[in-house]
Design a protein with these regions (language model features):
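P-loop/Walker A NTP-binding region and its immediately flanking N-terminal helices
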Residues: 1-166, 172-186, 194
């Protein structure tokens, strides 16, 4: 998926994010939970695009209908947009592993509207790493958004959980996936057998 319209099976997240965006009440930190492969990191990238998409150049606020053709969206899709920083907490568990984040949070975005930190497997961070990150969650700069992804929310300290808007991503039922694939095939002029 490249935008909220393609994010099937996650209707609660899509509707809540849409409403938050329209009311100008976006959280400064999001927690995406769910089983492996459910789309947490992909969803985080979609949120990052919504926060930074410039569309035809006139967008000055985050938008729900991501264009996927502006330079910002293209860079985020390619993984080389400087203001969307992805961190694998499983391989950087200690304070030193996230010091780069802690030190860089105070600086304004390079070209985006927001600096977005996507921290995958956040439950793997050590207690000291969480403590050092906490100050940024308690008093976040206006230009920073955090998106935490995890398969094990119960391992995340309450001090982090209480500062995030939480979305539990659901496993997509086979019937929903089959219908989605049939729609794609139909648009491409192809026919598929979902029972195969």
């Amino acid at each position: 998926p490249n935008d909220f319209g393609e994010l099937i099976g996650q209707d609660t997240l899509v509707k809540t994010f849409y409403n938050s965006l329209n009311k100008g009440r976006l959280a400064h930190a999001f927690l995406l939970t769910g089983i492996r492969g459910v789309g947490k990191t992909t969803t985080a990238r979609i949120i990052a695009k919504a926060l930074n998409c410039i569309g035809d150049g006139t967008n000055t606020e985050p938008i729900f209908d991501i264009c996927n053709i502006c330079s910002t969206c293209i860079s985020i899709n390619k993984g080389n947009f400087l203001d969307v920083i992805e961190v694998d907490a499983a391989s950087r568990t200690g304070v030193d592993g996230i010091r780069e984040i802690i030190d860089a949070v105070m600086y304004s975005p390079n070209s985006g509207r927001y600096k977005v930190y996507i921290i995958d497997e956040v439950h793997m961070l050590s207690t000291s790493a969480v403590s050092s990150l906490l100050k940024n969650l308690e008093e976040p700069p206006e230009h920073v958004k955090f998106i935490f992804c995890t398969t094990e929310p119960r391992k995340i300290p309450a001090t982090i959980l209480s500062r995030c808007q939480r979305f539990d991503l659901k496993r997509i039922p086979f019937s929903t996936l089959a219908k989605f694939l049939q729609n794609i095939a139909s648009k491409e002029g192809k026919e598929i057998n979902v029972n195969a």
